[in-house]
Amino acid sequence: MKKLKLHGFNNLTKSLSFCIYDICYAKTAEERDGYIAYIDELYNANRLTEILSETCSIIGANILNIARQDYEPQGASVTILVSEEPVDPKLIDKTEHPGPLPETVVAHLDKSHICVHTYPESHPEGGLCTFRADIEVSTCGVISPLKALNYLIHQLESDIVTIDYRVRGFTRDINGMKHFIDHEINSIQNFMSDGMKALYDMVDVNVYQENIFHTKMLLKEFDLKHYMFHTKPEDLTDSERQEITAALWKEMREIYYGRNMPAV
């Protein structure tokens, strides 16, 4: 896409939001409580702040304010307000390609923000536990939240991911013509690394004329030991392993497709 010469500030709002899910099987009530406590500590407000702060660095934003809170009995939230760093628009890469995977946070922006909320959940019957994190990165100007996509999925190891990206508003070029998007995109997947795409089955639902893009991701490989909390698969009988595998897979498909499915 040809670079635009703008009149004034770039008034486009670009919003990236996604839900990530981690699924676990905990055999007893004590194990379920243990999983919730573990995941609640793993994704506490301090760690989420670190992840979101690095996200700000990746997209090229200055942190203006950070608000964070851990909740009882569980859950956490972080909100960061950010401002765009001084940057030459000519240096902004607007092509479709994956963002970085740095080895390394949430804050307040003047016109942009990053926020995350966590939702640990379990049910006394069936032994299934889920952890959900809702994340939104919304920016104004030339910086793009898509740069942070690769990093966030990598940091928040996920079994299922649903992603939405939309562009709203318009900006004008020096001739007064309105532009409702300022970069090329035909799929969110184009901003993921090949290694990331190899791990997941993915489906797109896009409404190009409305600048709305949606991608769903489901982890391809199923290894039962990855989903067990304080229980080893080899300590279970064959029938128990089959029953737990079926329950986990059904849970994952229901979350992925967003509907309840009949028992097989």
Swiss-Prot record:
Q: What does UniProt say on post-translational modification here?
A: Is synthesized initially as an inactive proenzyme. Formation of the active enzyme involves a self-maturation process in which the active site pyruvoyl group is generated from an internal serine residue via an autocatalytic post-translational modification. Two non-identical subunits are generated from the proenzyme in this reaction, and the pyruvate is formed at the N-terminus of the alpha chain, which is derived from the carboxyl end of the proenzyme.
On subunit structure and binding partners, the annotation says:
Heterooctamer of four alpha and four beta chains arranged as a tetramer of alpha/beta heterodimers.
Recorded E.C. number(s)?
4.1.1.50
Which SUPFAM superfamilies does the UniProt record give?
Answer: S-adenosylmethionine decarboxylase (SSF56276)
UniProt GO BP = spermidine biosynthetic process
Query: What is the free-text note on the cofactor?
Result: Binds 1 pyruvoyl group covalently per subunit.
Quote the function comment for this protein. Catalyzes the decarboxylation of S-adenosylmethionine to S-adenosylmethioninamine (dcAdoMet), the propylamine donor required for the synthesis of the polyamines spermine and spermidine from the diamine putrescine.
Name of the protein this chain belongs to: S-adenosylmethionine decarboxylase proenzyme
The UniProt keyword set, sorted, is:
Autocatalytic cleavage, Decarboxylase, Lyase, Polyamine biosynthesis, Pyruvate, S-adenosyl-L-methionine, Schiff base, Spermidine biosynthesis, Zymogen
Key word Transcription present in the record?
no
Provide an example Pfam family for this protein: AdoMet_dc
The broad enzyme category this protein falls into is: lyase
The lineage's top-level taxon is Bacteria
Q: Which residues form the active site?
A: 112 (schiff-base intermediate with substrate), 117 (proton acceptor), 140 (proton donor)
Q: Which reaction does it catalyse?
A: S-adenosyl-L-methionine + H(+) = S-adenosyl 3-(methylsulfanyl)propylamine + CO2
Q: Which cofactor does it need?
A: pyruvate
Positions bearing Pyruvic acid (Ser): 112
**Presence of the UniProt keyword Transcription in the record:** no
Q: Which GO terms describe its cellular component?
A: cytosol
Site feature location: Cleavage (non-hydrolytic): 111-112
